[in-house]
Amino acid sequence: MGKKHKKHKAEWRSSYEDYTDTPLEKPLKLVLKVGGSEVTELSGSGHDSSYYDDRSDHERERHREKKKKKKKKSEKEKHLDEEERRKRKEEKKRKREKEHCDSEGEADAFDPGKKVEVEPPPDRPVRACRTQPAENESTPIQRLLEHFLRQLQRKDPHGFFAFPVTDAIAPGYSMIIKHPMDFGTMKDKIVANEYKSVTEFKADFKLMCDNAMTYNRPDTVYYKLAKKILHAGFKMMSKAALLGSEDPAAEEPVPEVVPVQVETTKKSKKPSREVISCMFEPEGNACSLTDSTAEEHVLALVEHAADEARDRINRFLPGGKMGYLKKLGDGSLLYSVVNAPEPDADEEETHPVDLSSLSSKLLPGFTTLGFKDERRNKVTFLSSASTALSMQNNSVFGDLKSDEMELLYSAYGDETGVQCALSLQEFVKDAGSYSKKMVDDLLDQITGGDHSRMIFQLKQRRSIPMRPADEMKVGDPLGESGGPVLDFMSMKQYPDVSLDVSMLSSLGKVKKELDHEDSHLNLDETARLLQDLHEAQAERGGSRPSSNLSSLSTASEREHPPPGSPSRLSVGEQPDVAHDPYEFLQSPEPAAPAKN
């Protein structure tokens, strides 16, 4: 029902025009008789009183009809339905809202008949409506992770992992778990687009399950559910499931539990006790399922760790090739690349390793490969600055020198052993002789007797008195060096020394004072040997080296030492021995047969 059309206006106009035309066709005539005379008076159209009377009557009738129509209209409006009135009020309210709303295009959605076109500026893009959800703007990785999150939440029908755990729910949770995680936090991170790959999502999912298994005991419901969800989630997000066409949700080990829980949660918000008992009653079956799939679970964890390592390497070293050496059965080496550009390839990327790939070509005129040792890269731990500073400030051996520190390292092995030994000795420094003896015995057992030998040599070095300067002779070789004279005879009381010290019985002291004539003979012999060495070097340096090893020149007769020379004689005058292993212990004085 709507408003009645005003058709009566057109009808009134037509009737009024007809009415105005009809009286003008034939005017009325009045005849008056006065005193026997007859007066005729014609009345015109504008002065006819009957015309005005008829017209006023017509207007009264028209006004009466208009009142009747208004009355009928008011009566009809009273009988309108309540729904129509409510609809009209809503339409009026919507119109008022459309007038006050901002220019975001809401008027077109409510009133399609009244369209207001607003042209946005060309340099500014049109903003989306705030009330509309931003589902259209989600990236493919977000949609994939949302699908994974929905699948994982179905495994948790009771919402154990839905919200963050507080100390009010689990006492002491914040003290045990330093990095909490739950499905709600993961969903917020998906919406905020904080996950750049599936690996990061898997890391947070594993963190959530590990937190549950760390806080709860293995016989609890939460521990078992976390273990189930962890296994199912890693299987669902594995590489084979992502790249394959099969649905991983259909291959899960417990397919009959999940649909039941989903139906019950749809019907009622709170799950019943029967469902909970059905879910967690067969504990033995649950344990057997997890035990039977332990290998698959470990495989999923290994694949996850490998994916994390590959992503980390590609992020820090893009385009780099890292790998390991693999030896084949025939003895050849292969370099297997770990972070290959195509990890899904059937064959792994390998490179053969041989001598030619590790070295350059031979230079002309040289028969061997050159090797240049960079001295700047050589660092010895015995003479480093940090070691000297850390070892000099101790209460057991104060003011250690470089040679004394070498003794310590030779006895205890490395810096850790030296620090441990010094710490033990400092601990029992003021405890008495018995405690010191126990520590010395312990260090001897650990070092195999090197501790006692080191202590003896260190005390011997520090107990030798220095000779005054006026007693030193000009020709005395000891006056220039000033080094202490060691007595090797003291080592004979240690039978467990690694070196053979039986030959020390025939020796006295290592250094003795030389006669004046013997020193001149030694100087002449040394000068002659140096001259021969200089001539031999000049002769060899002037010749061009051969390109083959077979054509190298042999040692000349001049280079061979004559028989009976001092270099051929040993301590016990044994000319048959080619090389004496204890040559460094010989006395500098010449042997008796040399004078003859």
Swiss-Prot record:
Its main location: nucleus. There is a cross-link at residue 372 (Glycyl lysine isopeptide (Lys-Gly) (interchain with G-Cter in SUMO2)). Residues 50-62, 74-85, 111-126 have a biased composition (Basic and acidic residues). The keyword Transcription applies. It is found in: Nucleus. Plays a role in chromatin remodeling and regulation of transcription. Acts as a chromatin reader that recognizes and binds acylated histones: binds histones that are acetylated and/or butyrylated. Component of SWI/SNF chromatin remodeling subcomplex GBAF that carries out key enzymatic activities, changing chromatin structure by altering DNA-histone contacts within a nucleosome in an ATP-dependent manner. Also orchestrates the RAD51-RAD54 complex formation and thereby plays a role in homologous recombination (HR). Binds acetylated histones H3 and H4. Binds butyrylated histone H4. Component of the multiprotein chromatin-remodeling subcomplex SWI/SNF called GBAF, which includes at least BICRA or BICRAL (mutually exclusive), BRD9, SS18, the core BAF subunits, SMARCA2/BRM, SMARCA4/BRG1/BAF190A, ACTL6A/BAF53, SMARCC1/BAF155, and SMARCD1/BAF60A. Interacts (via N-terminal bromodomain) with acetylated RAD54. Interacts (via C-terminus) with RAD51. This is Bromodomain-containing protein 9. It comes from Mus musculus (Mouse). The gene is Brd9.
